[in-house]
Amino acid sequence: GAYGQGQNIGQLFVNILIFLFY
């Protein structure tokens, strides 16, 4: 996302999902 803080949270969330699924 391009919301600044939301970008950080979204990136962490995606990283966790990738870590769990892969």
Curated annotation (Swiss-Prot):
rRNA-binding in keyword set: no
Record flagged with keyword Transcription regulation: no
Localization of this protein: Secreted, Extracellular space
A GO term for molecular function: oxygen carrier activity
Cellular-component GO terms for this entry: extracellular region
Function summary: Hemocyanins are copper-containing oxygen carriers occurring freely dissolved in the hemolymph of many mollusks and arthropods.
Family stated for the protein in its record: Belongs to the tyrosinase family. Hemocyanin subfamily.
Protein name according to UniProt: Hemocyanin subunit 4
